[in-house]
C-alpha cells in the first residue's frame, strides 16, 4: 500500500523489513540446529568405532557448516534488531508530545538498559498504547492498540525477569533442593515456559497493532495538514 506521509512510509518499510529478517533468522537458527545435531550424531558414531561407509571427517564438515549458520543467526538478529528499533522509534514519533521530557529516541535507548528496562517497559509499551488510543479517539478513528494486552505483557515480562534472576543463586543448591520435588521442578519450568510464550504472543500483538495504529495517525495528520494547506490556497 502506498502512503502519503513519509513517516507512515518509514514505519511500514521498517515493519516489513523487521519481519522479513526475523523469518530469515529463524530459518538460519533451524539450519544451525540441524547441522549441529548431524555433526554431534556423526561424532558419536565415529567415536563408537562404527565408521563403516562413513567419512570420519564428515562430522567436522557438519560442525563448520553449523558454526557458519550460528554466525549468520547473529548477523540476521542484529539486522532484525536494527529495523525493530527504527520501527518503534518512528511509531513513537506519532504520539510524541511537545512537552515530553523524554524523546522517542531516548525511550527506545532506555529499553536497552539492563534491569531498568523491565520497569521502563511500562512507560514504553503501555504508555504507547494509551497515547495511541487517545490520539485515535481525537481523530475519530476506530483503530486501537490493546492497553490491557500491553499492560499484561509488561507484567509477564517483569515476572519472567524475576524468575530469570534465580540464576544468580547457588544453582547446585537450588537444583538439589528442587530435585527432591520433581513435580515442583517440572511445574516451575513449565510455568516459566508458558510465561515466555504468552509474553512473546502479546509482544507480537502489540507490534501488529502499533504498526496499524501509528500509520493511521501519521496518514490522518498528513491528510489533514494537506487539506488545510489546500484550503489556505483557495481562500
Predicted feature locations:
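Membrane-interface extramembranous regions at the lipid-water interface
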Residues: 1-30, 46-54, 59-60, 79-159, ...
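Membrane-helix interface segments in multi-pass membrane proteins
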Residues: 28-76, 147-152, 156-201
Amino acid at each position: 500500500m502506498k502512503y502519503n506521509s513519509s513517516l507512515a512510509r518509514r514505519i511500514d518499510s521498517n515493519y516489513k523489513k523487521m519481519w522479513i529478517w526475523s523469518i530469515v533468522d529463524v530459518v538460519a537458527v533451524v539450519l544451525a540446529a540441524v547441522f549441529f545435531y548431524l555433526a554431534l550424531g556423526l561424532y558419536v558414531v565415529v567415536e563408537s568405532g562404527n565408521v563403516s561407509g562413513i567419512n570420519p571427517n564428515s562430522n567436522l564438515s557438519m560442525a563448520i557448516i553449523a558454526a557458519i549458520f550460528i554466525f549468520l543467526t547473529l548477523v540476521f538478529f542484529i539486522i532484525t534488531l536494527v529495523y525493530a528499533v527504527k520501527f518503534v522509534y518512528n511509531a513513537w514519533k506519532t504520539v510524541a508530545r511537545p512537552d515530553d521530557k523524554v524523546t522517542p529516541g531516548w525511550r527506545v535507548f532506555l529499553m536497552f538498559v539492563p534491569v531498568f528496562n523491565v520497569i521502563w517497559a511500562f512507560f514504553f509499551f503501555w504508555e504507547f498504547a494509551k497515547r495511541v488510543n487517545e490520539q485515535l479517539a481525537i481523530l475519530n478513528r476506530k483503530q486501537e492498540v490493546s492497553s490491557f494486552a500491553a499492560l499484561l505483557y509488561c507484567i509477564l515480562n517483569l515476572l519472567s525477569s524475576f524468575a530469570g534472576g534465580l540464576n544468580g543463586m547457588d544453582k547446585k543448591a537450588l537444583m538439589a533442593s528442587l530435585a527432591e520435588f520433581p513435580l515442583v521442578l517440572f511445574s516451575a519450568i513449565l510455568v516459566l515456559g508458558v510465561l515466555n510464550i504468552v509474553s512473546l504472543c502479546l509482544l507480537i500483538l502489540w507490534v501488529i497493532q502499533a504498526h496499524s495504529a501509528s500509520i493511521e495517525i501519521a496518514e490522518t495528520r498528513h491528510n489533514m495538514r494537506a487539506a488545510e494547506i489546500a484550503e489556505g490556497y483557495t481562500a
